[in-house]
């Protein structure tokens, strides 16, 4: 795990340390925010009540959160709860989308170029979440639990009230629901795990963190 963490830190330093690369990534993020928000979720947003909007554009919103979080981190203005929120969103919705397209392809038997583009872009979204997850820093258990609670509430809104993302004829609401439940549970457990809280606190305070 120590070697993996060193790789993650190296990638983070490379991206944030080179302005051209950093801002290119942020522009790509914002293109995803606009395209996904308008093309994929636009019709649903128009037909939904305003209170539900924060729960609807899952991946575009995650990309927006990531962009803001990365900019704050690069300019030494981190907001730990927001970094955790963005990391959770990117990992949850990135992995959910990868599962979504994998299930669709297995059932449909065909793969379209646009679908491949979406799959690859959500690998990137997931990776952004991993990078942000290593930069949470000083964040108490209550704030962590609230972040996990929000994404648990989003499951209720999506699948209990019918505001879940558009699905294909292959991907059923049951599959989508249980994928969301599993991802939220695993990420929530990770975020609130005492050993993770202690390790991230120690790093933020500049203390030595043992790595294998």
Describe these PLM feature segments:
Residues 36-45, 98-109, 158-168:
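Juxtamembrane "helix-exit" motif on the non-cytosolic side of transmembrane helices
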Residues 60-72, 123-134, 179-197:
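Hydrophobic cores of alpha-helical transmembrane segments in multi-pass inner/ER membrane proteins
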Residues 135-212:
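Terminal transmembrane helical module of multi-pass membrane proteins
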Residues 47-54, 108-120, 169-177:
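Non-cytosolic membrane-interface motifs at loop->transmembrane helix junctions
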Residues 32-81:
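Selected alpha-helical membrane-embedding segments in polytopic membrane proteins
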Residues 3-26:
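N-terminal membrane topogenic signal
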Residues 86-153:
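Membrane-proximal helix-loop-helix units in multi-pass membrane proteins
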Residues 12-16, 72-85, 134-142:
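Membrane-interface helix-boundary motifs at transmembrane edges
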């Amino acid at each position: 795990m120590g070697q993996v963490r060193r790789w993650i830190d190296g990638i983070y330093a490379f991206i944030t340390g080179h302005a051209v690369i950093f801002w290119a990534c942020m522009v790509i993020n914002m293109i995803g925010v606009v395209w996904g928000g308008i093309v994929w979720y636009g019709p649903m947003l128009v037909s939904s009540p305003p209170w539900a909007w924060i729960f609807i554009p899952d991946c575009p919103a995650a990309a927006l959160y990531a962009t803001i979080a990365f900019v704050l981190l690069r300019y030494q203005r981190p907001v730990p709860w927001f970094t955790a929120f963005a990391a959770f969103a990117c990992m949850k919705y990135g992995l959910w989308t990868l599962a979504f397209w994998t299930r669709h392809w297995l059932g449909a038997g065909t793969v379209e170029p646009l679908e491949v583009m979406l799959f690859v872009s959500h690998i990137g979204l997931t990776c952004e979440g991993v990078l942000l997850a290593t930069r949470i820093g000083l964040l108490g258990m209550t704030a962590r639990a609230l972040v996990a609670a929000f994404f648990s509430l989003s499951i209720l809104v999506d699948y209990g009230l019918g505001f879940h993302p558009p699905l294909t004829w292959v991907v059923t609401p049951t599959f989508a629901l249980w994928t969301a439940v599993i991802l939220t549970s695993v990420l929530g457990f990770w975020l609130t795990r005492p050993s993770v809280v202690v390790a991230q606190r120690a790093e933020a305070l500049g203390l030595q963190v043992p790595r294998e």
